[in-house]
């Protein structure tokens, strides 16, 4: 994975049995994985949880979820 926190990276995740691609900046991928570990979830499980409650696009919902969780798990 790139060291540049602003680099946009595309990853494939599985939601409800369907593969989908998500583009996020490296910094968001790092934090999303940290949150998944803290919750004892796989990355797919965490993204599925976010997907269930989103009203907009998935990438945006993930970014908002991460921002809302900053500091809660430290």
Predicted regions located by residue number:
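Amphipathic, hydrophobic secondary-structure cores in small proteins
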Residues: 14-66
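A detector of short terminal or domain-flanking linear segments
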Residues: 1-13
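Short, solvent-exposed charged binding patches
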Residues: 67-74
């Amino acid at each position: 994975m790139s060291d540049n926190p602003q680099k946009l990276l595309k990853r494939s995740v599985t939601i409800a049995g369907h593969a989908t691609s998500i583009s996020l900046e490296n910094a968001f991928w790092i934090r999303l994985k940290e949150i998944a570990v803290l919750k004892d979830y796989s990355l797919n499980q965490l993204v599925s949880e976010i997907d269930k409650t989103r009203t907009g696009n998935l990438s945006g919902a993930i970014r908002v979820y991460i921002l809302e969780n900053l500091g809660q798990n430290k």
